């Protein structure tokens, strides 16, 4: 950092989409850990933090009258972002002790107004990591119903049991997923 500042690289705002080296590093990370290939120049955007990215995604994708499916408990910013977009939150409960959800409850939360699914795995605040089977189910429904998924994966490397699997890695999901 000191060298960058001394060489005049840290004296102004960065490019709006993020510095190229960081976008390339993010692309390399996704390829190395998950086999997902992203173009750093057209498919990666660096924000000031995950909360900003979540707000931008929900505000860009939702309009008044849309519905967003979330899993509760949830990170409190989700509700605020959905409300700011004029959308309605539809809740699917994660039940202890394993914080599993009922597929029937998930399906009941969907309607013709559903625009997107907001998924957080590893989950805050429970630490739950959605299983391959759960993600396959969500992905299948998203593809069948042409839904978008915004996935909050900020804790992807804080996994104590199981493994983190990005929903974007399932068939038909890469092009309908915004990963944070």
Regions found by a protein language model. Name each.
Residues 170-180:
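Active-site PLP attachment segment
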Residues 1-49, 56, 105:
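N-terminal small-domain helix-loop-helix segment of the aminotransferase-like
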Residues 60-82:
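Conserved PLP-anchoring active-site segment centered on the Schiff-base-forming lysine
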Residues 94-161, 165-168:
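Active-site phosphate-binding strand-loop segment of PLP-dependent enzymes
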Residues 50-51, 75, 121-124:
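Short glycine-rich anion-binding loops that position phosphate/pyrophosphate groups of nucleotides
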Residues 72, 91-95:
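Short beta->alpha connector loops at strand-helix junctions that form conserved
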Residues 84-90:
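A short helix-loop-beta submotif of the ANL/AMP-binding
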């Amino acid at each position: 950092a000191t060298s960058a500042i001394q060489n005049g690289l840290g004296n102004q705002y960065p490019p709006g989409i993020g510095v190229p080296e960081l976008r390339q590093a993010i692309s390399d990370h996704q390829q190395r850990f998950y086999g997902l290939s992203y173009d750093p120049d057209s498919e990666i955007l660096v924000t000031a933090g995950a909360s900003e990215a979540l707000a931008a995604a929900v505000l860009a994708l939702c309009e008044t009258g849309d519905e967003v499916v979330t899993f509760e408990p949830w990170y409190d910013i989700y509700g605020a972002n959905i409300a700011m977009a004029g959308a309605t939150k539809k809740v699917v409960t994660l039940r202890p002790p394993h914080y599993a959800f009922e597929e029937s409850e998930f399906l009941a939360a969907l309607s013709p107004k559903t625009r997107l699914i907001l998924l957080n795995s590893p989950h805050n605040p429970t630490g739950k990591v959605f299983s391959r089977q759960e993600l396959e189910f969500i992905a299948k429904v998203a593809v069948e119903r042409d839904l978008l998924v915004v996935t909050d994966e900020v804790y992807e490397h804080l996994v104590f049991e199981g493994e983190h699997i990005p929903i974007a890695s399932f068939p038909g999901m890469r092009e309908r997923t915004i990963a944070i």
